């Protein structure tokens, strides 16, 4: 049996590894650190690579024209999440942070992609959103991230997408105290952001629970802005780490099992 895409046993509910060991002969992994985890358990795995490694930054001029944006602005993307609960919890903090960031850099223009029209409406309904210069659009994440040097991102695959497209992510997460108490006991990794997990180093800011505040977001923005080359080199290293052995080699690995 070949398992395509490993469950996140390296991060939480590690006891599931027993079922995988009993029923799976080879696991195809999206990330190299997953292969290292399986090797530590004396289990077979193959580094396929992540589909995001194929993402390409869009053409800036085409994106500006498509969305009616001015080239002179400093773009910062805000990705508040793909669930209404995340948007409800985090969007007020993001809007207040955006106001504060405009005091630091009045030339910022905020780009807010939404996964669908329902989530766009949820974002647009938030108080004070019209007090910040912004563009809110559906199905625009890749466009917006391609032209944003920095992004404020709710933790999840969006943080990886941002990093791949050259936008340094400020990774944020907050939930209610009960949920956090459960999650913090289950999660076994030192980082929650995929970009940091890939680098195995705390490179990109992670503002989690009580550490998430307006001041923390502004401080993270200032830190990243002051060292652009350092962060871009980390993005390049992260992107390199995502290139797996590919489908042809994967087919050969499967053939050897037969």
Residues of each region from the PLM?
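Nucleotide-activated sugar donor-binding and catalytic core shared by glycosyltransferases
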Residues: 1-258
């Amino acid at each position: 049996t070949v398992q395509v895409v490993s469950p996140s046993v390296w991060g939480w509910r590690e006891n599931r590894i027993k079922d995988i060991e009993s029923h799976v002969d080879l696991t195809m992994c999206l990330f190299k650190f997953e292969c290292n985890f399986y090797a530590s358990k004396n289990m077979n795995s193959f580094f396929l690579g992540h589909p995001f490694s194929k993402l390409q930054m869009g053409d800036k001029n085409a994106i500006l024209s498509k969305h009616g944006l001015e080239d002179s602005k400093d773009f910062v993307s805000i990705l508040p999440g793909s669930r209404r609960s995340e948007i409800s919890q985090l969007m007020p903090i993001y809007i207040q942070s955006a106001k504060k960031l405009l005091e630091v850099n009045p030339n910022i223009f905020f780009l807010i992609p939404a996964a669908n029209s329902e989530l766009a409406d949820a974002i647009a309904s938030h108080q004070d959103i019209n007090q910040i210069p912004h563009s809110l659009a559906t199905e625009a994440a890749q466009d917006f991230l391609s032209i944003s040097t920095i992004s404020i991102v709710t933790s999840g695959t969006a943080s990886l997408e941002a990093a791949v497209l050259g936008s340094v992510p400020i990774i944020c997460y907050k939930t209610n105290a009960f949920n956090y108490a459960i999650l913090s006991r289950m999660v076994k990794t030192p980082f929650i952001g995929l970009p940091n997990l890939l680098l195995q180093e705390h490179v990109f800011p992670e503002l989690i629970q009580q550490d998430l505040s307006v001041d923390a977001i502004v401080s993270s923005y200032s830190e990243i802005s002051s060292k652009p080359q350092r962060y871009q080199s980390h993005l390049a290293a992260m992107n390199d780490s995502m290139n797996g052995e590919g489908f042809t080699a994967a087919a050969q690995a499967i053939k050897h099992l037969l």
